[in-house]
C-alpha cells in the first residue's frame, strides 16, 4: 500500500527512499567508542589504523598503545567520570589518549589551542579537570598553567613523538625547545602504568565520552557533551550511507580534534570503518595541497578555503578520489558549479559533496552522497535523522519548499551543554510529538525529494530602510550570493552595522583577484551591486581585503571583520 503524502517533511521523510531497508531498520550500537572500533576491527588487526608522516601503525599496535595510555592514566589517579583537558592536534598520541580515557570511563575535554593561558585555566577549573595535556608548541602557556595550578598533573606531547626517526631528528634540530618543567613527557607518562592492570569500563547509556566547544562566532563558546552513543551513531549511519567506504581505504584527516567534526568524522569514523587514517597537521592550504598530492587519499574532507587552494594549485590528477566533501562555510551555486567543473577536468568522477551539521550534533546530520546529489543543497538527512522546518513565530511545521527554522531529531544530538541546563533547554525542545528536537537557529527548507537547502542564520536577518523610507529585511547571505557572481570577486562576507538613518546597513568585505586597481574594482563591484540587488540591499561600502580571517572551525570570522570595520572606519 502506497504511503500517503502529507506535504510535511518530518512525517513523510522522503529521503528514506534512498536508503536500504537494512539501513532504516538497523539497531544502533550500544557500547563505548573504544569497544565499537574494537568490534569493527576484530578481523583487521594487521590493517593500518594510522599513517603519520610515513609511520604506519597497525590496528594491533593501535589498541596496544591505547591500553598503555589507559594504564598510565589509572596510575596517576584518573577514574571513571573524571575529566582530562587536552590542548592538542590530531597526533597519534592524542588519539590514543582520547580512547585510553574512554577505556577507563573518563572524559576527554578538547580545548582550542588558540585559547590564552588564563582561558585554559578557567576551563580546567570549571570542568574540575584532573589532568592537563598539551602540545609543546604551546609550552609557554603550559608552564603558566602549571604555575597557576601546581596540583594538577600535566603531560607534554610533541608532534614528533610518532614520526619516523629521520623526520623526528630533523624536527628536533629545527624546533629546539626547553623541556624543563613539571610535566611528564609522554614516554615517562607511559612508564607509570607498566605494572597496572585495567579493564574496560562497562557501557552505560548516554555516558559522556568527550566535550568539545562551539566556535563562539555567535557568542561565548559552550561545552558540548557528546556521549559514546552520539559518536557511534554517526559512524554507524555513515556505514549505511551511499559512500564507497572500504576497509583499508586511505582517509586523509586534516581536521583538529578540538572540533566536533574532527572527533566524529576526522577520528572516529575512519577507525570505525577499518580505514587507514593519514594524519596531516599543518592546515596551511599550500602544505595541505602538497600532502594531498603525496598521500593520494581515497577520501578527503575539508572546507571551501582548502578546496579553493587545491583547485587553484596545479593538481592534475584526482582520479584516485572516491569522496571529496566539505563543511564549514557553504559555496554559492555558482562556486559549486565551478568547483565541480574543475574536479571533473582533473578526473574526479563525482561532485563536491556538502553537508550540514553543528557541534551539538557531532557536526553532521545531512550530507550529499555519490549519486544522491542536488546542486545548491546540503544533501539528505542520515537514515536515523529526522528533519522538521518550523515557523519561527508559532512553531508550526512548514510544508515542502517553505522557509523556516531547521530542527532535527537525531541519535547524535548532544546530551547537553556542560553545566548549562538553561542553554540546553533553549536549543533542545520537546515538541507536541513528544520527541526532543534541536533548534539550529538556521533558516532553510526541504524539498519533495528530501534535500535540505540552507537560507541563512535567523540572527543574521536585520531591518533597514530603503530610499522610499519603507522598512525592509536585510539578508547578508542574499548579498553575498550575488556579489560572488562578479568575475572579480573570489570571496565575500557581508557584515551589518547600525545606522542612525537606515537602522542597519550592509558592508561587504571582498577578496578580489590579485593585480586589479582597487578603486576601479571597488567601483565595478558597487555598480554590479546596484544592478543585481534591490536598492535596500546594496552595500554602503565595499571593503577590499587581502585575506579573509577564518576561525579554527573553517568559518569566516565575521567578528574580526566587525572589529576591523570599527577600527578603520
What annotation goes with each model-predicted range?
Residues 157, 531-556:
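AMP-binding/adenylate-forming catalytic domain of the ANL superfamily
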Residues 154, 298-301, 311-374, 386:
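Gly/Ser/Thr-rich phosphate-binding loop
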Residues 115, 122-123, 132-134, 410, ...:
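AMP-binding/adenylate-forming catalytic core of the ANL superfamily
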Residues 232-250, 258-299, 312-314:
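Conserved AMP-binding/adenylation subdomain of ANL enzymes
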Residues 1-57, 61-76, 161-178, 197, ...:
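N-lobe entry segment of adenylate-forming
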Residues 46-91, 95-99, 116-121, 226-229:
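Conserved AMP-binding/adenylate-forming core of the ANL superfamily
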Residues 380-384, 396-429, 457, 468-474:
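Conserved ATP/PPi-binding loop(s) of AMP-dependent carboxylate-activating enzymes
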Residues 73-79, 193-207, 211-253, 350:
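Conserved adenylate-forming
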Amino acid at each position: 500500500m502506497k504511503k500517503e503524502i502529507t506535504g510535511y517533511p518530518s512525517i513523510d521523510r522522503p529521503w528514506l527512499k534512498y536508503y536500504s531497508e537494512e539501513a532504516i531498520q538497523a539497531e544502533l550500537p550500544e557500547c563505548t567508542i573504544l569497544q565499537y572500533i574494537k568490534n569493527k576491527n576484530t578481523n583487521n588487526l594487521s590493517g593500518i589504523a594510522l599513517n603519520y608522516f610515513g609511520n604506519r601503525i597497525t590496528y594491533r599496535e593501535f589498541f596496544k598503545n591505547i591500553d598503555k595510555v589507559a594504564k598510565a592514566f589509572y596510575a596517576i589517579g584518573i577514574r571513571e567520570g573524571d575529566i582530562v583537558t587536552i590542548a592538542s592536534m590530531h597526533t597519534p598520541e592524542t588519539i590514543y589518549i582520547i580512547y585510553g580515557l574512554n577505556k577507563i570511563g573518563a572524559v576527554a575535554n578538547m580545548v582550542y589551542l588558540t585559547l590564552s593561558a588564563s582561558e585554559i585555566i578557567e576551563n580546567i577549573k570549571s570542568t574540575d579537570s584532573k589532568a592537563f595535556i598539551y602540545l609543546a608548541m604551546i609550552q609557554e602557556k603550559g608552564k603558566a598553567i602549571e604555575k597557576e595550578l601546581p596540583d594538577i598533573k600535566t603531560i607534554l606531547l610533541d608532534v614528533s613523538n610518532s614520526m619516523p626517526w629521520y623526520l623526528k631528528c630533523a624536527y628536533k634540530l629545527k624546533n629546539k625547545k626547553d623541556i624543563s618543567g613539571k610535566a611528564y613527557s609522554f614516554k615517562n607518562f607511559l612508564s607509570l602504568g607498566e605494572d597496572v592492570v585495567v579493564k574496560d569500563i562497562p557501557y552505560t547509556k548516554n555516558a559522556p565520552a568527550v566535550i568539545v566547544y562551539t566556535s563562539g562566532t555567535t557568542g561565548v563558546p559552550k561545552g558540548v557533551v557528546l556521549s559514546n552513543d552520539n559518536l557511534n551513531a554517526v559512524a554507524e549511519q555513515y556505514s549505511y550511507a551511499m559512500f564507497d567506504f572500504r576497509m583499508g581505504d586511505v582517509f586523509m584527516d586534516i581536521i583538529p580534534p578540538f572540533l566536533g567534526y574532527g572527533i566524529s568524522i576526522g577520528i572516529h569514523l575512519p577507525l570505525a570503518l577499518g580505514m587507514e587514517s593519514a594524519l596531516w597537521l599543518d592546515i596551511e592550504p599550500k602544505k595541505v595541497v602538497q600532502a594531498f598530492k603525496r598521500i593520494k587519499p581515497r577520501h578527503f574532507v575539508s572546507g571551501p578555503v582548502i578546496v579553493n587552494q587545491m583547485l587553484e594549485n596545479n593538481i592534475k590528477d584526482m582520479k584516485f578520489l572516491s569522496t571529496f566533501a566539505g563543511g564549514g562555510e557553504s559555496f554559492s551555486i555558482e562556486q559549486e558549479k565551478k568547483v565541480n567543473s574543475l574536479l571533473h577536468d582533473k578526473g574526479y568522477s563525482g561532485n563536491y559533496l556538502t553537508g550540514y551539521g553543528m557541534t551539538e550534533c557531532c557536526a553532521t546530520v545531512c550530507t550529499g552522497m555519490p549519486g544522491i546529489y542536488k546542486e545548491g543543497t546540503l544533501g539528505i538527512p542520515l537514515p536515523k535523522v529526522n528533519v522538521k522546518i518550523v515557523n519561527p513565530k508559532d512553531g508550526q511545521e512548514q510544508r515542502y519548499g517553505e522557509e523556516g527554522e531547521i530542527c532535527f531529531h537525531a541519535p547524535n544530538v548532544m546530551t547537553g551543554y556542560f553545566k548549562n541546563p538553561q542553554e540546553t533547554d533553549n536549543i533542545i525542545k520537546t515538541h507536541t510529538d513528544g520527541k526532543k528536537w534541536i533548534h539550529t537557529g538556521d533558516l532553510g527548507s526541504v524539498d519533495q525529494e528530501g534535500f535540505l537547502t540552507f537560507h541563512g542564520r535567523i540572527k543574521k536577518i536585520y531591518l533597514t530602510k530603503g530610499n522610499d523610507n519603507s522598512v525592509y529585511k536585510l539578508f547578508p547571505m542574499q548579498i553575498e550570493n550575488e556579489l560572488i557572481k562578479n568575475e572579480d570577486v573570489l570571496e565575500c562576507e557581508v557584515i551589518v552595522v547600525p545606522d542612525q538613518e537606515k537602522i542597519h546597513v550592509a558592508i561587504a568585505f571582498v577578496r578580489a583577484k590579485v593585480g586589479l586597481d582597487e578603486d576601479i574594482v571597488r567601483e565595478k563591484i558597487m555598480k554590479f551591486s546596484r544592478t543585481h540587488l534591490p536598492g535596500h540591499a546594496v552595500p554602503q561600502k565595499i571593503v577590499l581585503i587581502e585575506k579573509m580571517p577564518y576561525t579554527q572551525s573553517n568559518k569566516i570570522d565575521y567578528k574580526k571583520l566587525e572589529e576591523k570595520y570599527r577600527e578603520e572606519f
